[in-house]
């Protein structure tokens, strides 16, 4: 194990002992916010320190076995013990490396998932609907909560644009790799000649700001317009100006919400989505330099960056970032995404480990 890594683990062990002392004091719950911070930190450090203790025990076992090598009658036993201890140390060190990877501060946040139809007209809008169903089925499997924030339906039943809020443990950490361009190859329902068409949608996964106040938005920078909500094809579904369009003038970001009959609720939803979009923009600008120097699975935030192809005639899905092809498209479109997401998470961890190795 590298000295720098061991030094870090020793520091964490010392910190855990401090936390045990702080949490055992009688007045620990006097400040509930501080108590929650301490318990959260304790929960994060506990498994790491426990794993480190196992590594140290294995190192001690190896040292003890080395001392037995001088005894001819114990040599075979000692060599087995040394080999076993070293194997444990290698495995435990690899696990500790992953545990020490820098944690994305957004990983535990809820998300706004935005899907937009791109090239391909009606077929693209239908595929946007298919993608939405895929993510909703995945959310259902995770027991996450889903709330429709905004939708612009197409005439054939798909979506020109749709935004949902997904709330649940690890929502961002599991879905953050979905941002980018999604391409579909299939025979559209409207195609009479049986020809395969290619169309595309873009997906953006944005972490929800804890509070709107977390993102600084000057009210003077906002233009808020109200208009009548309308459904697919333009027919009015509401005779009052309940729909809300919020424009953030400095960035040009525009959010429309018209799903609720209450103008106040639509405005509140629009401001939440706006805060998430601004936060997402700031995040990608902040990491632009890093993304330029090394490949990043989360990407640049550029919607045109194609990340995945769904080929229906061949029943396959290919993720171009990690060169992974799965021939189980039907299950994937039904929300069975664990294998795909697991592969993306593993590759992301490998990227982080490589970058740490470069700087150590």
From Swiss-Prot:
Species annotation: Burkholderia ambifaria (strain MC40-6)
Gene that specifies this protein: prfA
Entry GO CC: cytoplasm
Localization (cell): Cytoplasm
Keyword Membrane: no
Protein name: Peptide chain release factor 1
Keywords associated with the record: Cytoplasm, Methylation, Protein biosynthesis
Main location: cytoplasm
Record keyword Protein biosynthesis present: yes
InterPro entries given in the database record: PCRF, Pep_chain_release_fac_I, Pep_chain_release_fac_I_sf, Prokaryotic/Mito_RF, RF-1
Disulfide bonds: none
Pfam families listed in its UniProt record: PCRF (PF03462), RF-1 (PF00472)
PTM per Swiss-Prot/TrEMBL: Methylated by PrmC. Methylation increases the termination efficiency of RF1.
Gene Ontology MF terms in the entry: translation release factor activity, codon specific
Function noted in UniProt: Peptide chain release factor 1 directs the termination of translation in response to the peptide chain termination codons UAG and UAA.
HAMAP family named among the record's database cross-references: Rel_fac_1 (MF_00093)
Membrane-spanning residues: none
């Amino acid at each position: 194990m590298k000295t720098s890594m061991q030094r870090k683990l020793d520091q964490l062990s010392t910190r855990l002992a401090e936390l045990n002392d702080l949490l055992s004091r009688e007045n620990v719950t006097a400040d509930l916010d501080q108590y929650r911070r301490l318990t959260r930190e304790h929960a994060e450090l506990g498994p790491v320190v426990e794993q480190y203790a196992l590594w140290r025990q294995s190192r001690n076992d190896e040292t003890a076995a080395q001392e037995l090598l001088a005894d001819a009658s114990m040599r075979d036993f000692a060599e087995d013990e040394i080999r076993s201890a070293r194997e444990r140390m290698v495995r435990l060190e690899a696990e500790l490396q992953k545990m020490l990877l820098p944690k994305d501060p957004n990983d535990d946040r809820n998300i706004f998932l935005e899907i937009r139809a791109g090239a391909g007209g009606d077929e693209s809008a239908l595929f946007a609907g298919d993608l939405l169903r895929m993510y909703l089925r995945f959310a259902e499997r995770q027991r996450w909560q889903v709330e429709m924030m905004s939708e612009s339906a197409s005439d054939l039943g798909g979506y020109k644009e749709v935004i949902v809020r997904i709330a649940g443990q690890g929502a961002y950490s599991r879905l953050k790799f979905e941002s980018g361009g999604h391409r579909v190859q299939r025979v559209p329902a409207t195609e009479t000649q049986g020809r395969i068409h290619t169309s595309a949608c873009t997906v953006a996964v944005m972490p929800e700001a804890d509070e709107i106040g977390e993102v600084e938005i000057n009210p003077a920078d906002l233009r808020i317009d109200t208009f009548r909500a309308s459904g697919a094809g333009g027919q009015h579904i509401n005779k009052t100006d309940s729909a809300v369009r919020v424009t953030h003038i400095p960035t040009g970001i525009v959010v429309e919400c018209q799903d609720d009959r209450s103008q106040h609720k639509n405005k509140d939803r629009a401001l939440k989505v706006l805060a998430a979009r601004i936060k997402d923009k700031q995040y990608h600008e902040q990491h632009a330099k890093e993304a330029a120097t090394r490949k990043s699975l989360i990407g640049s935030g550029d919607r045109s960056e194609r990340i995945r192809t769904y080929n229906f005639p061949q029943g396959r899905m290919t993720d171009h970032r990690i060169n992974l092809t799965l021939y189980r498209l039907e299950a994937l479109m039904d929300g069975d995404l664990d294998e795909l997401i697991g592969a993306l998470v593993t590759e992301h961890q490998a990227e982080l480990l490589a970058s740490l190795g470069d700087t150590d």
